[in-house]
């Protein structure tokens, strides 16, 4: 990593509680959390936004959210993000078939029409040489209302923030997803 984490005792007490919970849940503390937590106000904002986007009552299915986060992570070369989000995709879908086919989703029969338009939208937002068109937005509207499109756009934007942060700071994968 290009910036190292501080010793745990140097983080505020409430962040140490968060780290304790991560260690209990994942058997380790996530490196990006330790980096964001060097600036506690940023950590709090990022954690709140992530929790809002990944809530149970989201209009986006858990599998769809995972497909989006893995694809953005692939594009932005975030090895940590591909690791953790692929692990979540496996847990949510029960299979890594779509995860393994994600880089070539356009040529795969594994993805339904909704997933394909969402992945096209994801790429249009993430790649800097692409634009979201009115035609693409019209196809999205076949599957989502305005609030759903806003949530999807927010998720894509958040994952771009997260994956670019982790990629720039060279956060390594932590072994969450062991693909056979």
Please annotate each region the language model reported.
Residues 26, 57-74:
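Immediate flanking context of iron-sulfur cluster ligation sites
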Residues 68, 72-86:
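Short, thiol/selenol-centered motifs that function as redox-active sites or metal-ligating centers
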Residues 41-44, 82-101:
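Iron-sulfur (Fe-S) cluster-binding segments and ferredoxin-like electron-carrier domains
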Residues 113-154:
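Acidic/histidine-rich alpha-helical segments that form the ligand environment
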Residues 1-60:
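Mobile cap/lid helix-loop segments that border enzyme active or cofactor-binding sites
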Residues 102-113:
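Acidic/His metal-coordination segments adjacent to aromatic residues that form catalytic metal sites
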Residues 146-180:
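Preference for long, well-ordered alpha-helical segments
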Residues 36, 50, 67-72, 102, ...:
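Short alpha-helical scaffolding segments that buttress acidic/His motifs in well-ordered protein cores
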């Amino acid at each position: 990593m290009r910036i190292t984490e501080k010793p745990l005792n140097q983080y505020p007490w409430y962040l140490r509680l968060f780290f304790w919970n991560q260690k209990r849940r994942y058997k380790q503390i996530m490196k990006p959390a330790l980096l964001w937590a060097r600036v506690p106000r940023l950590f709090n904002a990022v954690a709140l936004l992530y929790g809002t986007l990944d809530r149970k009552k989201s209009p986006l299915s858990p599998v769809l959210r995972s497909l989006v986060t893995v694809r953005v992570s692939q594009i932005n070369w975030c090895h940590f993000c591909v690791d953790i989000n692929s692990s979540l995709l496996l847990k949510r879908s029960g299979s890594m078939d779509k995860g393994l086919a994600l880089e070539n989703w356009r040529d795969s029969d594994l993805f339904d029409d909704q997933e394909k338009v969402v992945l096209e939208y994801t790429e249009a937002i993430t790649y800097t040489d692409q634009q979201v068109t009115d035609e693409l937005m019209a196809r999205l509207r076949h599957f989502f209302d305005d609030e759903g499109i806003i949530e999807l756009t927010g998720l894509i934007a958040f994952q771009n923030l997260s994956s670019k942060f982790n990629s720039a700071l060279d956060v390594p994968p932590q072994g969450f997803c062991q693909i056979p």
